[in-house]
Swiss-Prot record:
Residues 490-710, 1071-1306 form the ABC transporter domain. GO terms for molecular function: ABC-type transporter activity; ATP binding; ATP hydrolysis activity; ATPase-coupled transmembrane transporter activity. Residues 426-451 are annotated as: Disordered. Its main location: membrane. ATP binds at residues 522-529, 1105-1112. CDD domains: ABC_6TM_ABCC_D1, ABC_6TM_ABCC_D2, ABCC_MRP_domain1, ABCC_MRP_domain2. Belongs to the ABC transporter superfamily. ABCC family. Conjugate transporter (TC 3.A.1.208) subfamily. GO terms for biological process: response to cadmium ion; sorocarp morphogenesis; transmembrane transport. Residues 427-449 have a biased composition (Low complexity). GO terms for cellular component: membrane. Keywords: ATP-binding, Membrane, Nucleotide-binding, Repeat, Transmembrane, Transmembrane helix, Transport. It is a multi-pass membrane protein. This is ABC transporter C family member 14.
Length: 1317
């Protein structure tokens, strides 16, 4: 109550100052242009501040006051970064790294060469630190001499005050130098961090197909977060500390020899003997950290794969399979992290033991050589030892950082040296960071190539990198010794991949004439996509020549790449908005009707990978992007495979056939060879009946200034930011994951007991010096001193080990809970949160919990136990000191209350602003081919630079706020030392205790600021816990079972049907939809409206309709990927909403529209639970016509596949592999969603026969645009705008002249007419 009243008064006192500062801030000019998208808008106040303001950090006061009065900071409260610290500037310093000499230290040498000269002020500050460290013990020696003098004539008050002032000046000088050293060092670290992050992203945009196999997105995220942080931390202060701490140790040992004579050399010898042991322990700790990072990479990659493919994982009911795989990697990661911590504990134990042995050996030698332990000698030596203890602690840590730095340097250097796409080398010459890259495709490049035919002569293309590759600008040969071990590990990991899939296109000859349509046809897996990639420079050309390829190419990939942005932004793709051209493109791609049905029209956010769109809509948006780019050459890879015949005909007429420039259509549909030349009119005759429904294209273009429409258009939710202090319940929740309250209390108590024991050792030295126990020799005092220190070291080991067990248990349980919670979350969660944001919880936030929480909890406990015991000791010795200490405590409280809100909020913004960095990295990684083809690298680099600058801005001002509080509390500490030393000199009769009080005050000086900073840092890391906890508490899918003894309930408390009741379910396969309504968003229009139909046992149902009509939504509802808002879905008479999800999904077979291959072998992809024999697996492989392809691979079923199977199979073959796994299992109900859309006509007919033979007793729902795929079904369901408009046999529907199905039949192209007739 008193504290709240006091704080209210303080706020009133400061309110006028805040208003004045706020008015000044509002009048400050903007540092960003008016059209800038940067969230910062005010220039950095440090740039225009006075020298005194820079030294005292007064320029940060405005930000401090904002945070205090608002209790929260918004992004527009944070100032802009100084221009010199922006990544646009710092990244240039890494532009010319020379890897050609094969040096394993090339990166680190380059950083030293380019970044160290900027850090001269840090070096100067470090020199002053060393000088003041030397002066403070000398000043203390004179002061203790004064205190121990019994002659009143020599003990004038003025002399005492002067000596106290000199001591405080030396301490204050050291403190100011230390803070400036940290600040200048941080700026250097900051620049290194920004530059490396930028370079890693730039390199990601250049990765070749071979490099992508090695560097999955999860591994790159780990490199960008963990490894970059390791290097930047080293270039904060550690690189200078190695020299300065060594120098400080030598100076202090020299000073020790000055105080105690040659006895100091004995202590020096003990230290020299012990230092190699500490170094060895640091090295072992570093090795275990490197091992843990390898498993962390693997865990993050698997987690990334799970998150980005969460829908197929859920549909196949494979969540537990991947959870177990991730947990296994996590177990190994924690194992090596714990071993690292054990050696860290031993290291700290050795440091404490070493410091004590140095002190005891020095004092023992000094005493045994006939010298008397006087006050000035004892306590001056104690102060020297106290000052010596820090460099003794930090020098092994500096060495550890230097040793631990090399694995991170190696990982980043190898990544930056990895092979690049040939296309990226071509594009890199034209990258311009000073514009938005809006015109690179709009204006035709007047290159001679644009008017020529594309000619490919005698070319051989290959996916894998040639053995002697001379296609790169730098030499790939590396230091053999450095890379030998890594190459062996890489071979073990990738031998199955690299040896098996050396796919080549041999002796290719092709002419693509300007102004004509060229079609590339072939059976599945014949190399069509490889040829297209050869044209655009994405695979290696071993021989031959390619000429006439224009600079501007529009490209649509077989699996469309879409940004997590609005539909309009996906079409514009960085180009300027031309409304007339935009309208024309929308009409040409038949998107008008689709856009009208979207909540925010063309400004609707379509989500990562177009998650809320149908396959046909995604393809048409990709096609619209190609047309809008207005390029010289258009390359379409299967642009019609996911659209219905009517739309396909429209697209062919208005998009593909109507282009005036070079255009290439890659398809498996036209049964002609490349060698056969004929006009496109002869290949495809369009007999399309245009739908009568006409929609004005003007009605689909949104007004960006309409707030209601913008709100409706949003899909992604804003990331939550915790505000205010971290409450006690948060800490309680954190510790509940790993320990009981009793264990925690005992562990924390050990810190206070340990510090009390250590303080007893100081009292014992005072007793020893005063010879308070008569008749006892020095060996008596030495023996008991060693006993006290032995108890302290034992307590240190016990408390640190106990705390490490607690934190590691918490980290393990927290990650497990996070993984399960996210995996079992509803699909809506993944629709509204980008994968980069989710992965941030598993990388950066998890790393904070694993690595930093132990250190922080230990440091906070040490700090406050030391402050508590130390202050009690001082007050016990000098009771009068409580008066100035109370006043100092009040000031201390005010400062920490001013400081904590801003520091806490800035650190929270740091975590939040890191998510867009990871999200953009993930997004660009998935769309490298499209980004490079459209030459959009510079646009995404600029966006990434902006994201990095925003994140670095939060770090920059967070650190400035830390220095602000440190500077002020260090001054307070000096004042405390002054009053304590003055009171000891004037008011204490016991000279030994007086000297002890002064040395205690000196030791507490740094703890005042350190304690507050550690508390705020702990609050920040608890923010990582809160972010993880918020994901643990997200709503789960229904019917995820929670064990409650013998009974089972689902996560929403509803009773479910147990698996025991559904042992043979479904045994008939009867499916019934009753008035089903489905909504993807709560307030949106239904995607399925009042849908009712019934499928009898073993019936074959074909589901057709215009692209985006709701066909795939039917599939999603059957698997409960989205729950019914109205109505029921029954299978064999049982309401599926009451069936456990695991049981439901594992009981229905699925061949998804987008083929799903996960990281593993061919065998594990077909039979993930190892349920079937080799014979059964090969039998199913033969049925889907993949036997020859897999048999040609040396390792056959054990062939390793990467995520999405990009290293082994074509898109069509991946579809066949998915069909294979479905045939293998005996499902009663099977759903096929465009199962053969990317397979050539001949193979599709063979697969159709296989399906008829193997699924004859199954109930099948087949979604297809190829009408010949479903023409033999028992019934056809025609879906339009989410409604069932026709449901009858094919023959009956065909006999109705105006039926929708009949119209679809008529619009089918000639390749299907033969079958239909």
């Amino acid at each position: 109550m008193f504290i709240n009243s006091f704080e209210t008064k303080i706020k009133k006192k400061f309110s006028l100052l805040y208003e004045k500062l706020d008015d000044e801030d509002e009048n400050e000019p903007s540092s960003s242009p008016s059209n800038s998208t940067n969230n910062f808008y005010k220039a950095c106040p440090e740039d225009n501040s006075s020298k005194w303001s820079k030294i005292s950090f007064n320029w940060v006061t405005k930000l401090i006051m904002k945070g205090y009065f608002k209790e929260s900071l918004e992004m527009n409260d944070i100032y802009d970064l100084p221009e010199l610290n922006k990544v646009q500037t710092t990244s240039k310093l890494l532009d010319d790294i020379n890897f050609s000499n094969g040096s394993k230290y090339a990166l680190i040498k380059h950083i030293y060469k380019n970044f160290l000269p900027k850090n001269k002020y840090a070096l100067i500050s470090n020199i002053f630190i060393t000088i003041f460290i030397f002066l403070s013990p000398i000043c203390l020696k004179f002061l203790i001499n004064y205190i121990s003098t019994d002659n009143d004539n020599e003990k004038s008050i003025l002399k005492g005050i002067l000596l106290c002032c000199l001591l405080c000046i030396s301490i204050l000088g050291q403190s100011i130098s230390q803070e400036l050293f940290y600040w200048f060092g941080m700026k250097n670290s900051f620049d290194v961090r920004g530059a490396l992050t930028a370079k890693i992203f730039e390199k990601t945009l250049k990765l070749s197909n071979v490099s992508k196999k090695k560097y999955r997105s999860g591994k790159i995220m780990n490199i960008m977060s963990i490894d970059v942080e390791n290097i930047s931390e080293f270039f904060w202060t550690y690189y200078l500390d190695i020299v300065s701490h060594t120098l400080q140790i030598l100076i202090l040992l020299g000073l020790l020899c000055y105080v105690v004579g040659p006895s100091g050399l004995v202590g020096f010898g003990v230290m020299v003997i012990a230092l190699p042991i500490n170094t060895m322990l640091c090295t072992k700790s570093s090795n275990y950290l490197e091992k843990s990072l390898e498993y962390s990479d693997s865990r993050t990659n698997l987690t990334s794969e799970l998150i980005t493919n969460i829908r197929p994982f859920k549909m196949y009911a494979w969540e537990n399979l991947f959870i177990n795989k991730i947990e296994e990697q996590r177990k190994q990661e924690l194992k090596f992290l714990f071993l690292r911590v054990l050696f860290w504990i031993f290291d700290h134990m050795m440091i404490e033991t070493n410091a004590t042995l140095v002190l005891v050996s020095t004092f023992a030698t000094y005493s045994l050589t006939g010298n008397t332990m006087s006050l000035d000698v004892t306590f001056t030596a104690m102060t020297i030892f106290a000052n010596l203890k820090l460099p003794l602690i930090y020098l092994p840590e500096d060495i550890y950082k230097a040793i631990g730095l090399m694995p991170s340097v190696k990982r980043i250097q190898n990544f930056l040296k990895s092979s690049e796409s040939l296309k990226s080398k071509e594009n890199n010459q034209n990258i311009n960071f000073n514009n938005n890259n809006n015109n690179n495709n709009n204006n035709k490049n007047n290159n001679n190539n644009d008017d020529n035919d594309i000619i490919i002569e005698n070319c051989t293309f290959q996916w894998n990198e040639p053995e002697n590759n001379n296609l790169f600008e730098f030499n790939q040969s590396e230091d053999e010794e450095e890379n030998e071990e890594e190459e062996e590990e890489e071979n073990e990991e990738n031998i199955k991949i690299n040896e098996n899939f050396d796919y080549k296109l041999n002796d290719i000859n092709l002419i693509v004439p300007k102004g004509k349509l060229t079609m590339i046809c072939g059976v599945v897996g014949s190399g069509k996509t490889s040829l297209v990639c050869g044209l655009i420079g994405e695979i290696y050309k071993l021989n031959g020549s390619v000429s006439g390829v224009p600079n501007n190419i529009s490209f649509t990939s077989q699996q469309p790449f879409l940004l997590s942005a609005s539909l309009r932004e996906n079409i514009l793709f960085g180009n300027e908005f031309d409304i007339e051209r935009y309208k024309k493109v929308i009409e040409s791609t038949a998107l008008t009707k689709d856009i009208v049905n979207l909540a925010g029209l063309d400004l609707t956010e379509i989500g990562e990978r177009g998650i809320n769109l149908s396959g046909g809509q995604k393809q048409r948006i990709s096609l619209a992007r190609a047309l809008y780019a207005n390029s010289d050459c258009f390359i379409f890879d299967e642009p019609l495979s996911a659209v219905d015949p009517e739309v396909a005909s429209h697209l062919f007429d208005h998009c593909i056939q109507g282009i005036d420039f070079k255009s290439i259509l890659k398809t498996k549909e036209i049964k002609k060879n490349v060698e056969n030349e004929t006009d496109s009119e002869e290949l495809i005759k369009n007999e399309i009946e245009i739908e009568n429904e006409i929609i004005d294209v003007n009605n689909v273009i949104s007004d960006k200034n309409d707030p209601n429409l913008i709100e409706k258009a949003k899909l992604l939710v804003k990331e939550d930011k915790n505000e205010g202090e971290v409450e006690f319940n948060v800490y309680k929740k954190y510790f509940s994951y790993g320990t009981s309250g009793v264990t925690l209390f005992i562990t924390i108590s050990l810190f206070f007991i340990g510090q009390a024991v250590y303080k007893v050792s100081d009292f014992w030295l005072a007793i020893w010096t005063e010879r308070s126990i008569e008749g006892k020799s020095d060996s008596f005092y030495i023996g008991y001193y060693l006993l006290i220190i032995g108890i302290f070291v034992s307590l240190l080991m016990i408390r640190t080990y106990s705390l490490s067990r607690i934190t590691f248990g918490i980290g393990k349980n927290l990650h497990s809970a996070l993984l399960k919670s996210v995996t079992y979350a509803s699909c809506r969660f993944f629709d509204t949160n980008p994968s980069g944001r989710i992965l941030n919880r598993f990388s950066k936030d998890t790393s904070d919990i694993d690595i930093h929480m132990l250190d922080l909890l230990s440091e906070v406990s040490i700090c406050f136990s030391e402050l508590t015991i130390g202050l009690i000791s001082i007050v016990f010795i000098i009771p009068i000191i409580i008066i100035p200490l109370t006043l100092l405590f009040i000031i201390y409280y005010i400062y920490q209350r001013l400081y904590r809100p801003s520091a806490r909020e800035l650190n929270r913004w740091e975590s939040i602003t890191l998510s867009p960095v990871f999200s953009l990295l993930q997004e660009c990684y998935n769309g490298l081919l499209t980004i490079r083809t459209y030459k959009q690298e510079s646009r995404f680099i600029k966006e990434m630079f902006d994201n990095i600058n925003i994140n670095l801005g939060c770090i920059f001002y967070s650190f400035a706020v830390h220095r602000w509080i440190s500077m002020r509390l260090e001054v307070m500490g000096c004042i405390m030392v002054f009053f304590t030393s003055l009171a000891a000199a004037l008011f204490t009769s016991n000279n030994g205790l007086a000297a002890l009080s002064v040395t205690t005050a000196l030791s507490l000086n740094g703890y005042l600021s350190w304690g507050v900073r550690r508390i705020v840092e702990l609050e920040v890391k608890m923010n990582s816990f809160q972010r993880i906890q918020s994901y643990i508490e997200i709503p789960k899918e229904g019917n995820k079972l929670i064990s409650t003894g013998t009974n089972q309930v689902d996560s929403d408390g509803l009773k479910t049907i147990s698996n025991g009741d559904l042992v043979n379910w479904p045994n008939k396969g009867i499916i019934e939809f009753k008035n089903v309504e489905i909504k993807y968003r709560p307030n949106s229009e239904p995607n399925l409206k009042d849908l009712s139909f019934k499928v009898q046992s073993s019936e074959k149902i074909g589901i057709v309709g215009r692209t985006g009509a709701g066909k795939t939504t039917i599939a999603s509802s059957l698997f409960r990927m989205v729950e019914c808002s109205k109505g029921l879905i029954l299978i064999d008479g049982i309401d599926i909403s009451k069936v456990q999800l695991q049981k439901l999904r594992s009981s229905i077979g699925i061949v998804p529209q987008d083929p799903f291959i996960f990281t593993g072998t061919i065998r594990s992809n077909i039979d993930p639970f190892n349920e079937f024999t080799d014979f059964e697996i090969w039998e199913s492989i033969e049925k889907v016509k993949l036997k020859d392809a897999i048999n040609s691979m040396p390792l056959k079923l054990e062939t390793a596949l990467q995520e999405n199977g990009d290293n082994g199979f074509s898109y069509g073959q991946k579809q066949l592999l998915c069909l294979c796994r479905t045939i293998l299992k005996n499902f009663k109900i099977i759903l096929m969603d465009e199962a053969t859309s990317s397979i050539d006509y001949h193979t599709a007919q063979l697969i159709k026969q296989t399906i008829q033979e193997n699924f004859k007793d199954c109930t099948t729902l087949t979604i297809a645009h190829r009408l010949e795929t479903i023409i033999d079904c028992n019934k056809i369901a025609v879906i339009d705008s989410g409604q069932l408009i026709e449901f009858d046999t094919p023959s009956n529907l065909m006999n109705i002249p105006n039926s929708k199905f009949n119209k679809l039949i008529k619009s089918q192209t000639d390749y299907s007419n033969n079958k239909i007739k």
